[in-house]
Amino acid sequence: MLTSLSLTALALLPSANALVRKDGVGRLPALGWNSWNAFGCDVDSTKIMTAANEMVHLGLKDLGYEYVNIDDCWSVKNTRNSTTQRIIPDTQKFPDGISGVADQVHQLGLKIGIYSSAGETTCAGYPASLGYEKVDAEAFAEWGIDYLKYDNCGVPSNWTDQYSSCVPDGSNEPANGTCPGLSNPAPAGYDWTKSNTFTRYTMMRDALLGQTRTILYSLCDWGQADVNTWGNETGNSWRMSGDISANWARIAQIANENTFRMNYVGFWGHPDPDMLEVGNGDLTAAENRAHFALWAIMKSPLIIGTALDGISDANLAVLKNKYLIEFNQDPIIGRSAHPYKWGYNPDWTFDPAHPAEYWSGPSSTLKGTLVLMLNSENSTSTRTAVWKEIPELKGHNAYRVTDAWSGKDLGCVKKQYSASLASHDVAVLVVKEAC
């Protein structure tokens, strides 16, 4: 039986100083595409340029999607340039080098990202950046890179942490968001900025800040070393969990975990629940909608992870939902939506199978309040949004409402709105002026 997590304890969690960059880079959640979920190691310039061209052709660029990110396996394996010590792009995959692809991406009015790791090798065994931070940052800047995803693989034993941190992820069998079986836990009150993980990630931050080119820094340390407490002074997004996979159980686990990280969301800083799986695996249409909607209202980075040249109209429509993107990219209100009621569980319950089901958040771009209702159950069920329960809507009994999926004006809705939802589906409402 799951118990409840204390709201008081959450309120006492510290906030971090934000890493403010030039030209607003990193102020809002990043929007873009990444090669890994679609292609893994099978990446090359053709696939990157196909994605870039499709982002323009499909109208994604017009909605704010701008980063085209190369993930792991882009370089020659097992060696660096003996003269410059730089990582060597694989010319079989990238005949014009990374800079050549960057030029083509920039010509489309888009930005380009690259991948490395805070270890000696990447997750796929390619050269990584630990000990070469300045060399690699200089190369990335020279090549025209705009975004760095920095992973946590290949860490040698002398760079591992003294203590283990609690990441209440799926495989850890978390008890109410804690890790009772954790080996070698840190003592209470331990300052994780003293950890080797913090040092490894700040070394690359400082190397990037030393370049004249502004490169968005996306930390991928899988939630380790209590990164939520220092991620925002180090980068503009930070992974708060282990990797995602294209199945509902994993998506629900990460959504549940990230629910308890919303106090860390704000301008310049965004907990990252990993790249999108919309269009991948055996996700149902309902699950694709719920996945994207939850990531968007949490003000997470929205990094597409599917092959865009074969995407279905239905999945493309999900990724292009203007209401959710406008909420995610609000230039005036930095906070995310928050759960106002858990629904399936008592409030503040940590349940990897049943995340909080009722969410709301104010939006300057939508000129109203976004309301989300999730059916986390395995069968069709009704969810009801009661206006007086929603913090932003307690002043009146009736409001004008728009269905964010269909765009339909639902008219003046009195007291509450009910929706019959298929398993793992969501209703998303834009609630505007009183009527």
From Swiss-Prot:
Main location per the UniProt record: secreted
Glycosylation sites: N81, N158, N176, N232, N378
Record flagged with keyword Secreted: yes
Hydrolase is among the record's keywords: yes
Residues given in the record as substrate binding sites: D221, W222, G223, Q224, A225
TM annotation in the entry: none
Active site: D151, D243
Disulfide bonds: C41-C73, C123-C153
Role: Hydrolyzes a variety of simple alpha-D-galactoside as well as more complex molecules such as oligosaccharides and polysaccharides.
Family classification: Belongs to the glycosyl hydrolase 27 family.
Protein name: Probable alpha-galactosidase B
